[in-house]
UniProtKB/Swiss-Prot annotation:
Protein name: Bifunctional glutamine synthetase adenylyltransferase/adenylyl-removing enzyme
Family: Belongs to the GlnE family.
Summary of the function given for this chain in its UniProt record: Involved in the regulation of glutamine synthetase GlnA, a key enzyme in the process to assimilate ammonia. When cellular nitrogen levels are high, the C-terminal adenylyl transferase (AT) inactivates GlnA by covalent transfer of an adenylyl group from ATP to specific tyrosine residue of GlnA, thus reducing its activity. Conversely, when nitrogen levels are low, the N-terminal adenylyl removase (AR) activates GlnA by removing the adenylyl group by phosphorolysis, increasing its activity.
Source species of the chain: Bordetella parapertussis (strain 12822 / ATCC BAA-587 / NCTC 13253)
A GO BP annotation: regulation of glutamine family amino acid metabolic process
Length: 941
């Protein structure tokens, strides 16, 4: 038995290693050589080939397969003991080697057993193609996450695609074939013989557990997950991975792999908030808390502190902390959909869900506990997680891990204390409430009585609501009673299952109470009832509002303040759960973080073959836009944002989404490897002027600066795909309406135009109104060099010499056309289109820019109407007091328009006396600049 330095730490700790070397002295030389190199996939493949023998057939007989796999497992285990305890192997090498071993073992056993069965029964075949049909072997838990410990069992689920039968002389059904195959595989992997075993194998995570068939068809799995799948099964399927096992030549399981992933992802990662799921996850956390205590009592009171997996602050708690955020938020943030724990933790840190310091501490604790776990298992090749109680053995463990006993105990205690505290606060960390030592929110009616678990029929709740309405809404009782009757009589409510109806009965009185406490009680009550009727079929949202009274109160305040906000929430109930964490909703939007996370999430939207999942990507971008807009809306309604700041934020959001759209669409149209898009997206109109509203269209022009031969066709195709990406209605709605009519030659022109052609058009063919529009244009997204070139062209066009009188006539004529196109036959003042309204200010500003930018270059800058008017006043182009007054008037008009939009008004009109002073100021500006016709000729002295 050698005592060479590489073996010293391992021999001192591992009785298993000592016994193997005593029994096989020649093993020491082999091991000394093997432990000099990392245990990689290539190393395992070489060992497998060596152990199989030089003349081995491509598919080993089952008995030969059994022996080879057990010897391979011993090589891996012994080499890892030496490398790990000698400080040569990190955690990634250890768990990676064990996972590769499992993949090899399962794949090899599958091929061997399948060949024996096929020789008797023939091959199972796909019904549609007739091709051989593989069994789909799914690795669950740590096997799925590629993080097996060194003495782990493996959890498998066996699936297959089509029903049907084999093609041999003794035909059996595919179902029976895969069942027999599974049954015969198990001894090859888990039976203990003279060479030991490969892996203990557990099939109980399949649907129905031990009571169910050994192998399930994908259709049966789908029915099970949809109809009976439980929350702990979501947790189990999170790491599920299709293993690389293929037994039949000419088979192609890609379609089945895609089908499996299309079942797994929406089952595990739900797009919509689900209170039932949250409650089940809370219960799962309590089970984790209590599981070891029960086991400890059954084992004569073993202290749970000795179990580094199930005890307080153990590995299982770290797994729950990380996977909780994945389960709650992974449906909307695909970047969190990682099977590996550390990968998921890193993704959560990058997404801002886990503070940097906490993430580092969790990772350090995980690495420490996993290494300790492996050391415990190296000792006697046992699946144990119990720290030795004997002080001498404990000191030996510390030494094996490179610690002094006191330092080991201190480090262990620090890690476990941090993990335990974080575990208790896991739901707060995931953004789902405060510290969880407090009881769950009480399920009460608005009158304070506890919600009856078996409430009466709908007429009972109607009677209770009637009394509440007459008490709290006496002036509007009749109208509200009528609305209550229609709500309770609607098909959506009548068809609710009992559980949802009970929630509705709890929610409606609470909604009336919340509405009564707002600034517009009747409006709030009616709008809340509209919202509730819309979401009635989604029990998760009923539960959310019923179980979180603070959230319901926030919704009530929002809908009371703005019918437009009420409509927005009704159309996009996905946003409701963002109201749970009110503080987060009022944090300023970090556009750099939004862009980073969006890119990561879009990158993660992949089909099983690695191609981008375009539908998921398009929906994700829409969901992100809705969430960000809703965050701004909440801040807007609480008075946190001015109209100007809000428009800046909405415009920045649109720019960000345009840039990401280019990145996602370009690979779909470009076939030249390595080519980058030289496209500049030019924003006109409201987006160009950074005056975007919640529901504004995007006025865009696509310009390119690329000399490749197919540039015109390529960028036209890119423009079409971008427009479709932005404006197509998907299950998540439409991102933006897009208007491309401001491009050269309008609808008759090319969809994308070269910068040279754009410049030539602007110099020689553009109408004056197109130069007016150019004053508000800006580079918004795309190639920065092309964007800079556009800005230079724009500046050159704006400073061109012009016939002032002719320009004045054109501007007046265009203003008349706009008035004719927006007739106002009411007595109200249209704050945008009527004389003295916003359009007059915009036209005056554009006229001043086109007249004077050549001599006052500062006017070239796209600074917005208010800033440009002020600069014109400072330059003496208009009276400075009038410039400031007109800017203030324009700001007031915009604010009035915005408030009316929030009230759901289609046309922003007010009584004629309401904005009389502002209207008079704008009329004076118009008269001074365009009617008198003198300001354009000379500067004001």
């Amino acid at each position: 038995m050698s005592s060479a330095p590489p073996f010293a730490a391992a021999l001192a700790w591992s009785g298993h290693l000592r016994r193997r070397l005593d029994a096989h002295p020649d093993l020491a030389a082999w091991l000394a050589n093997a432990c000099a190199h990392p245990v990689s996939a290539n190393v395992l493949a070489a060992w497998q080939a060596e152990l199989s023998g030089p003349d081995a057939p491509e598919v080993l007989p089952v008995e030969q397969c059994r022996g080879m796999l057990r010897k391979l497992r011993e090589r891996v285990f012994l080499t890892l003991i030496v490398r790990d305890l000698g400080g040569q192997a990190d955690l990634e090498e250890v768990v990676g080697a064990m996972t590769v071993l499992a993949d090899i073992a399962v794949g090899t056993a599958y091929r061997s057993v399948a060949a024996e069965l096929a020789a008797v029964h023939g091959l199972p075949r796909e019904q549609s193609t007739g091709d051989p049909q593989e069994m789909l072997i799914v690795g669950m838990g740590k096997l799925g996450g590629r993080e097996l410990n060194v003495s782990s069992d493996i959890d498998l689920v066996m699936l297959y695609g089509d029903e049907g039968e084999t093609d041999g002389p003794r035909r059996i059904s595919n179902h029976e074939f895969y069942g027999r195959l599974t049954r015969r595989m198990m001894p090859a992997l888990s039976e203990v013989d003279a060479d030991g075993q490969v892996f203990r194998t557990d099939l109980r995570l399949r649907p129905d557990g031990d009571a169910g068939p050994l192998a399930w068809s994908l259709d049966a799995l789908e029915h099970y997950l949809i109809g009976q799948g439980r929350e702990w099964e979501r947790y189990a399927w999170l790491k599920a991975r299709l293993m690389p096992a293929q037994a039949f030549a000419d088979s192609n399981p890609d379609a089945q792999a895609r089908q499996l992933e299309s079942l797994r992802v929406p089952f595990v990662y739900r797009k919509y908030f689900d209170f039932d799921a949250l409650a089940a996850l809370r219960a799962l956390r309590e089970r984790i808390r209590q599981d070891w205590q029960r086991r400890a009592l059954a084992r004569n009171g073993v202290d749970s502190a000795n179990n580094i997996k199930l005890g307080d602050g153990g590995i299982r708690e770290i797994e729950f902390i990380v996977q909780l955020s994945q389960l709650i938020r992974g449906g909307r943030m695909p970047a969190l959909q990682r099977r590996g724990l550390l990968e998921a933790l890193h993704a959560e840190r990058a997404a801002g869900l886990v503070p940097e310091g906490d993430a580092q501490k969790l990772e350090a604790a995980y690495r420490f506990l996993r290494r300790t776990e492996h050391a415990l298992q190296y000792r006697e090749d046992e699946q144990t997680h119990l720290l030795p109680a004997d002080p001498a053995q404990r000191a030996a463990l510390a030494a094996a891990l490179g610690y002094e006993p006191a330092a080991f105990e201190r480090t262990l205690a620090e890690h476990r204390a941090f993990v335990s505290q974080t575990f208790r606060n896991a739901f707060r960390l995931a953004g789902m409430g405060e510290e969880d030592d407090s009881p769950a929110p009480a399920r009460t009616h608005a009158n304070g009585h506890a919600m009856r678990p078996h409430a009466g029929a709908l007429h009972d709740i109607e009677e209770r609501l009637a009394g509440q309405i007459q008490r709290d809404f006496p002036e509007h009782a009749e109208d509200l009673l009528r609305r209550t009757e229609t709500l309770l009589g609607s098909h959506r409510v009548r068809s609710l299952p009992d559980s949802s109806r009970h929630r509705l009965e709890a929610l409606l009185p609470a909604a009336l109470t919340a509405a009564a406490q707002t600034s517009a009680p009747m409006d709030a009550a009616l709008r809340l009832f509209d919202l509730i009727e819309t979401i009635a079929q989604r029990s998760a949202y009923l539960a959310l509002l019923a179980e979180y009274p603070d959230t319901l109160a926030r919704v009530a305040r929002m809908v009371a303040a703005s019918p437009w906000a009420a409509q927005y929430l009704t159309q996009h109930p996905l946003l409701l759960d963002s109201l749970i964490d009110w503080r987060t909703l009022f944090e300023p939007l970090d556009f750099a973080q939004v862009a980073h996370q969006l890119a990561a999430d879009l990158d993660a939207c992949r089909l099983p073959d690695g191609e981008p999942d375009i539908e998921r990507q398009m929906n994700l971008m829409r969901d992100v836009q809705r969430q960000a807009s809703f965050q701004l809306l909440a801040q807007n309604l609480e008075g946190e944002l001015t109209v100007e700041k809000l428009a800046d934020q909405l415009s920045a959001l649109a720019d960000l989404l345009l840039a990401e759209t280019i990145r996602r669409v370009w690979p779909l149209v470009n076939r030249r490897p390595g080519a980058e898009p030289h496209l500049a997206v030019i924003a006109y109109g409201k987006l160009g002027g950074k005056e975007l509203g919640y529901a504004s269209d995007l006025d865009l022009v696509f310009l390119f600066d690329d000399d490749r031969e197919d540039a015109a066709e390529l960028y036209a195709k890119l423009g079409r795909r971008m427009t479709s990406w932005l404006s197509t209605m998907t299950s998540s709605g439409r991102l933006y309406e897009v208007d491309l009519r401001l491009r050269p030659d309008g609808d008759a022109g090319l969809l994308a135009v070269s910068l040279e052609a754009f410049e030539q058009y602007q110099r020689s063919h553009a109408w004056p109104w197109e130069h007016q529009a150019l004053t508000r244009a800006r580079y918004a997204a795309g190639d920065t060099e092309a964007g800079a070139r556009f800005e230079r062209i724009r500046a050159d066009i704006l400073v061109m010499p012009r016939d002032v009188q002719a320009l004045r006539g054109e501007v007046l004529g265009m203003r008349d056309k706009i008035s004719a196109g927006h007739p106002n036959r009411s007595e109200l003042f249209d704050v945008k289109h009527d004389r003295g309204g916003m359009v007059d200010v915009e036209f005056v500003t554009q006229y001043l820019v086109l007249c004077h930018a050549a001599t006052h270059r500062v006017l070239v800058n796209n600074l917005g109407n208010i800033a440009l008017l002020r600069l014109a006043g400072e330059a003496g182009l208009i009276p400075a007091p009038l410039a400031l007054a007109a800017g203030d008037a324009y700001r007031t008009l915009r604010r009035a328009q915005h408030q009316l939009r929030l009230k759901g008004v289609d046309k922003a009109r007010v009584p004629p006396g309401q904005l009389a002073a502002e209207r008079a100021t704008v009329c004076e500006l118009w008269q001074t600049v365009l009617q008198d016709g003198t300001i354009a000729q000379a500067e004001v002295k």
